Swiss-Prot record:
Residues 1573-1712 form the VPS9 domain. Residues 157-392 form the Ras-GAP domain. Keywords: Coiled coil, Endocytosis, GTPase activation, Guanine-nucleotide releasing factor, Membrane, Phosphoprotein. GO terms for cellular component: cytosol; endocytic vesicle; membrane. It is a peripheral membrane protein. This is Receptor-mediated endocytosis protein 6 homolog. It comes from Drosophila melanogaster. Residues 503-513, 666-691, 847-859, 961-977 have a biased composition (Polar residues). One of its GO terms (biological process) is regulation of protein transport. The keyword Coiled coil applies. Residues 438-541, 639-704, 812-895, 938-1056, 1150-1277, 1317-1338 are annotated as: Disordered. Residues 454-466, 652-661, 883-895, 1007-1017, 1024-1034, 1194-1238 have a biased composition (Basic and acidic residues).
Amino acid sequence: MEPPAAGNLLEIMDLARTLRQEQLFIQQEQAAFAQLTGAFESNAGTITKLAFVCAQQRQILNELLLARTDQDPLLFCRRASAYDSAQFVDAKQLLPYEHALAYEDLFNYLYNTPYLLALSLATADRLSLLSASQLGQIINTIATGLYGNAINTKDVELLLKLLRELIEIQLLTSEQPRRLLRTNSSSFARLYQRLVESLFSARIFLTAALHAPLMGVLSEHEIWLDLDPHKLMQTFTPKEREKRFGREGDEEYQRNVARFHAETLGKLHSHVQEFVKSLQQSWALFPSSLRWLLQTLSQQLRQSLRHEEQEIRQLLTDLVFTHFISPAIASADLLGIIDVNVSERMRHNLNQIVKLLQRLALNDEDSELVQLMELLMLGQTGEDVVAILPQQSDFERSQLAINQRELAQLVEFFRLLTARDEYDISVEERQRLQRILGRIPKQQVQQQQQTPKDAPDSRESPEKSKKSNKSLMSLGKAKKKLAKGMSFSSGSSNHNPVPVSEPLTNGQANTSNGSGGLGADLEHCSSHSGSNTSLSSCGANMPTTNDPLDMSTSSDPVLVFSLYNAGAKSKLKPLTEEEVLKMNSIGQDGSNLLPAVVTTAPLAPSSNNDDVSSLEAMRRPQDDASIGNSDNLEAISEAAHSVASSLDLEEQQERDVHENEDNLSDMVSANVSGRGTPNISGRDTPSSQVTDGDGAGGDLGHHHGVHARAAANPQMQKMLLSKARSDIEDKFCKFELKKFEGDENVSIISDTWSTDVLASDSENTLDATVSERGDRDRNFSTPLIPSAVVLPGDNNFVVEALARAGRVSGVHGPQLDASDQRSESNWSTDVLASDSEKLAEIDTDDNVSITTKSDTTAPQAAVLDDDDEDEQTPGSSGDGEPDPDRGNGSERSQEDSAFFDAVNSYEDANLYHGASSLARSSVRTSYHVLGGESSFQQQYKCSGADSSGRKTTPLMGTSCMRRQTSAESSISNQSLNLEEPPPPMGKHHHHHREHHHRDYHHHHRERERERERERSALKKKKHQQQEKEHRDLIDFSDCSEDKEELARNRDEEQPPGLVQQLLDMINQDEQTGAVSSSSPNVEHRRISIEQRSAIIDGRRNGILAGSMRRHQSLNYENHEIMLNSMLPKTDDDKQEMLLCVQTQQLQLEERRGSAGLRPEVDGASGIAAAGGSGLKPPTKATGAIPKSISFDASADKDKQTYHRDGERDRERDRERERDRERDRERDRERDRERDHHGAGIFNKLRQGIFKNRRGASAKNASNSSNQSNPAASTSSVQADIRSVSFDPSAGCDNFGTHYCDTSEDILAKYRRKVSSSSEATNSDSTGNGHGVGSTGSVGAAAHLHKHMNGGHIPGVVFGCVKQKLRTVLSRTDLHSGDFRQTSTTSTTMATPLQIYLQIQLAQCISLQRLPQISHVAEALRCLAQLERPQHGQLLAELQRDLERRQSYLQYLMRHRQQLLLRSEQLEQLEARLRGEARSSQRCLLQALVRMYLAWSRQQEKLEQFQAEFAQLRASDERVELTEEFVESLLQELRSSADLQDEWQVDAARVAIERMLLEQMYEQVMFPNEDADVSRDEVLSAHIGKLQRFVHPAHPALCIAQEYLGEAPWTFAQQQLCHMAAYKTPREKLQCIINCISSIMSLLRMSSGRVPAADDLLPVLIYVVIMANPPYLLSTVEYISCFLGKKLEGEDEFYWTLFGSVVKFIKTMDYLD
C-alpha cells in the first residue's frame, strides 16, 4: 500500500485538470488584456485626431457665420469636407527628424508653462503685433492643437491655469476689465470662448438647463416675441396687419393691437420664467472648472482693491450669462443642444429672451438669477484646480495634431515675440526660446536677413550646450511664479537656419491676404516674402483670391507630434500573480511588520510635475532595448572621457536649472532610426539610472555626512561627447579577458571621471549634486563604479531601510531616496557589465590605481553634523514641496496598487518592532519604471530598525532582502549578513580624482578631511562592535522546513562579526605574504569573473527556493552576500543557474579536500564561498568605490594605446603610496582588535579558499568544515550548505582548467533577454561546453549526488520540483482516464504521481509533442531525487497554492471588468466626437444652403417654384413638384461644394428640404388654409375634454395592470408635443417613432418580455390624449402625403399604429 501522503492517481488527475483549467483561464485573460490594451492605444490616437477635426470644423462654422456676404460659402464647405478625409502623418516621417524634434521641444515646453504662454498672448494683445484674425488663429492653434480641444482632464487643467495667468496679467491690470471680456477683444475672452465650447461638462449643463424651454419656444408655431411690440407691428405687411388686427383706425383695431402687445409681453415673460426655472433646477450641474475660474477671478479682483463690488458682480455675470448661457440660447442648434432648424423668426424670439435674461441678471438685484450667481461664489474659494477636476483616467493624450500652416504661424509668432524688448520674460527663458526656435528652419530670405542681434545667440548656444553637459539640473531649486517646464532640446541640432522642407511650402507662397499681410511690426522684424509662415487668417476677412491657399492648406496632411505625457499605458497593465499574492499576504502578516515611514506626498499642483511624468516616456519598458539595455559597457568607457567635474555643479546649477537641452532627441533617434543614427549602441544615450527627483528637487540622502542635493537627471543633460569615434577599437578591447601576471596596485579613481556623465547600469547616483557646503566638506566619489554593484531590478531596499533605521534610532544615518535607484528599466538586463566583466572595459587611462589587494577598509560610518542636516523623509523635496515622484512618478497609478489600501495599518512606529514579514511583501514587476511601486511599497519593504535605541549603521543595521519576480535579479551584491550583529565599522576611504585643471588646494583640503574622518571612525569601532542581536526581517513562516531552524538559529549565541573576522584574517595574511605562490591577490579575480560568467543569468533570473535560500553565501565581485531572504519559488529553470554555481563550489571542494578546514560556525551564519575578498564593502549610501574592484584590462596597461602626461602619473604614484600606508594601518588596527577570535582557523580557511585562484578551483568552506568536523552541528551546517544541481553531470560549468570567455560568448550574453515568464527557460550564460573536461568534475558530481540522496538539500529540490510539477500538470491533459492504481505499484516502487507522469510521457511520445516530452521527462527526473513522502508533500503544496491563487483569478476578472469599462468609455467618447463632427457639418451645410438660396439667382428659382406650387391642387402633384425642385438644387450644390461623401449628400438634401419647406410651411401644412386650422382646433378641444376623465386605469383603455407602474409616460408625451417645432415630414415622423419606441422600452422593462401590439395600443391612446399635440389632423395628413408611400418596416408599423390611434380618439365618447 502506498503511504497516504502520496495520494492516489484519481486525485492527481483531478488536480491536473484543475491546474489546466486555471492555466487556460489565465492565458485567455492575459491575451484579452493585450488585445484590449492595444485597442486602447489606437483609440487614443483616433480620439486625438477626431478632436482636432471637430475643433477645426467648428472654427470654420464660426468663420462662415461671421463672414462677409461677399465671400463664397462654398469655400468654407470645401475646407470642412477636406478635414473629413485629412491624412494624419507622423511629423518625424514628413519633416526632417531634427526639425520634428525641435517642434516637439517647443510644444512640450509651452504645454507645461502656462505662465509663459499667457505672457506671450498678453504681450501680443498689448502691442497689437498681430491683427485680430491672426491672433485668433494663434489662439485656435493653442486651444485645438496644444491643448487637444480640451477633451482630456489634463488639458482642461492646463487651459484653466492659462486662463488664471491671463486673469493676473490682463484683467487685473486693466482699468475696465469688462471691456476685455467682449468677443475677440482679448486673449482671455478668446480662450474662454474656446473652453466653454469644448468642455463636455458645459454641454451637459446647457442641455439640462435649456433643452426643455427651448423646445417650448420653438413648438409655438406663430409666436412673435419682442420687448417692444411696436417694432413687431412694423414688420407686418399691410395685408398681415389687416388680417390680424382689422382695418386700421377702427376701435377694434386699437383693442386688437393692445391685446397683441399684452399677449406678446406675457408670452415673453412666461418663456423667460421657464428658462429661469430650468436654470434653477439644473444649477447644481454647473461645471466645477468654470466655477473655480469664476471664484479665482472674484477673489483676485477683490484682493486688488481696485474695483467695486458691483463692478465685480457685473463682470462675473458677463462671464456666466453674456458669454456662456446667452450664446447657447441664441445658437442652440449650432452647439448641438437641439436638433431643430431655427428659423429667422425663432432666432429673433430667442434673442429677445436672451436680452431679458441678461437684464434680470445684471440689473435686478432681487431676481433669481442674481441668487444663482451668489451660489456660484460659495464653497471652496481659491481651491486648487487639481482638486476640483474629475480625476478620470479613461483617456490619456500623448499626441498633438496640427496642420503645417498653423505650425508655421505659431513658430513665427514666438520668433516675433522674442525679438521684441517688450516681451517681459526672464533672460534664460528668452534664450531658451531662441535656442529652440533656432533649431527650427527659416526660409532662405530670412537667413540672409538675420539680424546681428540674433547671431551671438547662435554662437553661444553650442557653448551653453557644452556647459549643460557638465552640470546636473535640479528643477526644484526654488518655486518660482513661472511654472518652468522641462526642455527636451536634443542639443545636437544645427543652430544654423536650415531651409524648410518642401511639404511646408506647397501651395503656400501667396502671402497677400485680406488683412493686409502681417502688419508693420511683423514686416519690420522679419521678411515673409515667399514664406510659408505668414500669419493669415483661416477664413475670416479673406477674399476669394486666396482660394488656392485655403484649398492647398486643407489638403495638406496633418502633422502628429508626440507629447511627453506620462502614464498612458501604465494604468492598464495588470499585476502579476506574485504581486497579487504578496499584497494579500501583507494584510495577513501585518502584525509582524516594522513601522513603515509612509510618505505619499500629494501631487504638486504646479506644472512642474509634468516634467517628472514626461521623462517617463523616455524610460518606459518598451524603450529598454534602446535606452535601458544600451551597451552600458561602451557608455562607461565613453563617459570616462568627460571633462566635466562635480565642482561645476554649483557654478551652473543656478544658471542651467531650467536649461536642460537634454538628449531626448538622441534617445528617440536610437529608438526610431536604429544604428543609422549618431546613437550607435546607446553611446550617446544618457545614463539609464535616472533619479526621479527632478520635478520638485526631491531630496536625496546625506552623502559622506553632508547634506546632498537631489541628484539631477543624467537623462536631462546634454550628452554630446566630443570624443572622436576613433577609439572604438579600444572599446571593443574590453572583450579580451586577460589574466593578471602579478599583483598590481591600480586606482580606479580618475581625474577625468565626473558625476554628471554617462553612468553604468550599476551606478548609484547618490552624489550627483551637492549643496554649497557639501561641495566643500566631502570628497567626490564617482558614480561610475558604485560601492556595491546592484544587479538589474535591485531597488536597493536595504539601503533605504537602513538609512531610515539610522534616523529612527537617533543617529543621523545616510538618507536615501529609494526612487533614485528604483527604476527598473534603467538597468541593462542584457549587458550586465558589473556582473560578468567586472567593468574591466572601462578606459584604463582613467583607472589610475586599481588595487588588487583586498582592502580592509570598512564602510564609512554615518557620522553627520547635526548642524549640517536638513533631515527630510525620502518622500519630501529639498524645497519643502511635495515630491512629485511620490504622487506622480510611478508609472502605475496609485489607485492600481493595493499597497496604498494597507498604508494606514502601519502608521504607529512603536507597535511593530519585531521581525518583519518582508518575504511576502516585496514584489515588483519590470514595468514599474518610475519607482513604480509607490513610496508605501518601497518603504514598507525596507521599514526601519528595531527600537532598541542602538546606533544602526548603514550596512549592518536592521536590513532586509526581498522576494523578486522573474524579471529581476535575485541578489544584491551588498554584504548582507542578516542574522549577525554588526562588525566594527570603519571609514571607507576613497578619493575622487578631479580633472587636472581643477584647483589643487581643493584636493589638499579634501585629503585632510578624509584623514580626519578616518581617525574619528577608528575611535568608534569598539562601540560599534558591541551592537548585537539584529532581528531577521524575513518571515519564513510560509516555508515549513525553515521554522525549526530559524528558531534554533536565534537561540544560539553567535560571535560578533564572524564573516568580517574571517575576511580580516584573510586580508591580514595577504598583507603579510602568507599566501601560496600563485599570486592569489590577483587570482581571486579569475574566480570572480568565471563565477559571474557562469551565473550571470542565474543571478539575473535565478531564484532560490525554500530554506535553501537562507544563509546562502554567494560571492559577487569582492563582496560577501549573506542571503537570509525568502525568494519566490517561481522560475524552476532559473534555479539551475544558481545551482550551477553551487556545483562549482562542490567541485572546487573536491579538489581542496585535503585542506581540512574546520570553521567554527553555527547555523546562523554562512562562510564565504570562492572568490570572497577581505573588503568590507562600503554602504550604498556612500557611493564609494572599493579599492578591491579590479579590472582585468588594467593589467595590460603597457599594451593600451592611451597616453598619460607626467603630472598625472606622478600624482597616481603618490596616491598609491598613501593608499598602501592607510591599508597597512587599518590592517594592524583590526588585527589588534580581533586577536581573540580564532585567527588560526581563519588563516587556514583563507588559505584553503584563496590558495589557487588562477585555477578557479576554490573550496567551499562550509562543505569542508562539514566533512572534517563531524562534531559540528550537522543540521546547522546542512542548513548552510545549499549547493545542488538536479543533474550532477549535466548543465554545470567546471573550471578545473583555465577558463576564458571568448568575445562571442560575452556578446551572446548581451543579446539574451530576461524572460518575464515563469516558465521561461534561461540558458546558461556561459554555455555548457566551456571547460567541462575537468578531471575534478566527476568527483564533484558524485559528491553532489551523495548530498542529494542524503537529503542534505531538501529546500532547493522541493521548491524547484514543485514549480516544474505545476508547469507540467498545467500544460498536459489526459486523453484517457482508463488507469487505476493497483498493487503492482508496490513492486515498481512508483508513487501515483510518478505513474501519472509516466502516463503523460507515453501520451506525449505517442502524440509527438516534443516540448512536453522534455518537460515531463525533467519532472520525472526531479521526482526521482526526492524521498517518497515528499511526493505527497508536493501534491499538498500544489493544492494549497491552488487555493491561494484564487485571489489572483478574482483579480484577473476584476481587471477584465475594468478594461471592458474603459473600452466602452473610449468607444463612447469616440462616438461623441464623431457626433459632434457630424453636427458641425450639418450646421455648416445648413448655413451654406441658407446662403445659397439667398443668392439672387436662386431667389428667382424659388419664387417661380412657389408660384407653380400654388397653382396645383392635387397633393400628389405638389409632392412630385417639390421633390423635383429639391433634387435640382441638390445637384447644383453637390457640384459646387464638392460633396463627395454620401452622408454629406444626404445632409445637404435634408438641409434643402428644411429651408424650402420652412418657407412654404403654411402652404404644405395647411393646403386648405383656415379650413384645416379649424378642423385641428375642433379635434384639440375634443381631446381636451377627454383629458378630464381619462386616466391610465380607465376601463375604456384596458391597460394591463403590470404596465401601470410607468404611467404617465412623460417622455413619450414630450416627443409628441415637440412635433410642432419641426417643419419637415421626416422630422415629425421621427418624433412619433421616438414616442412609440420609448413606450415599448418601458413596457419591456416592466414585464420582462417584448410587448405585443395589444399591449402598446392602449398606452399610446392615453399618451396621445394627455399630450394633445397641436394641429394633429393636419400633421397626420402632411406626413401621409409626403411619406406615406415611402415607409417600410418598423417605421411603417409605428406610423400605422399612430394613425389608428388618432382615428380611435376621434370616435371616443365622454363617458366616465
